[in-house]
Amino acid sequence: MRAYPIKTRYIKRGENFIPIVVEAIKNSGIKLEDGDFVVLSEKMVSTAEGNFIDESKFKPGVLAYLCYYWSKYLWGYVLGKLLKVKEDKIKNLRRMPKEETLKHKQTIIEIVGLRYALKPYAEGGVDLTNVPGTYACPLPKNPKKWAEELYKEIKKELGVDVVVMVADTDATYRVLNFYFTALPYAIDGIISGIGVFGFILGRLADVLKIGGFAGCTPLAIAGNEVYKKYSIGELTRIAFICDRVHKTIKNINEVLEKYNTYVITEEILEKLEHTPVVVVKIKEEYKPESQR
């Protein structure tokens, strides 16, 4: 299996990405073949839907304070260690800024619910990276529709029968023979909608050696039905590999420092490199740069 990130320009809020993605694939020099996977970032799809929420408009209530202290102190100093959360995540929880976190937690409570806000980080698929200003970006409202539309356009323009997947970077966990995610929804075969309980189950499975991290989470899939022969574990692994090759903002503070600003703007986002699409060739063997 080998993954190829596809560069596009920054997709703006409400902009139809389908012709942009098709053109980017044409210009990439990669020859698509029947059965290849074209994997889309959920952020690009949600941005195209205009699905932004301004967190500055939310006034924190009692539950937001509860979620803040629960995340920063109980997870940062107790549960994080017990459930073997990565050390960098624990450090970030302990440094969690109060004002911004309270607004973010209140947003999560009102948009997707308390059971997602209780997750210490990456709550409910609501993302703060690669979005301008004080906006947050929830999961796409209809990822299946976009996957189907892109599939049809690729088949029409390029004459190939591919699989189109929309995937989120948030984890899917395996517990024995079952798959869980803390996200509000996922493809069939992954138990979703359980919020923080999915996260706790996944961490416990890792500690007890009965499962653990399986990969990233496919939200929708369409096109060539060859995908039906793949297990949930294989599909989450494909999504994970795509996440590894995406070029995206990993550290907002580094970007703010580089551009000497306190807020990310669309103008800054347009200057950054974006690879919200990844082509995965299942049958092609990965080779290190030195062997190519």
Curated annotation (Swiss-Prot):
The chain crosses the membrane at residues 175-197. It holds the Pfam family F420_ligase. One of its GO terms (molecular function) is coenzyme F420-0:L-glutamate ligase activity. The keyword Acyltransferase does not apply. GO terms for cellular component: membrane. InterPro entries: F420-0_gamma-glut_ligase-dom (IPR002847), UCP006563 (IPR012030). This is Uncharacterized protein MJ1361. It is found in: Membrane. Its main location: membrane. It is a single-pass membrane protein. Keywords: Membrane, Transmembrane, Transmembrane helix. It comes from the Archaea.
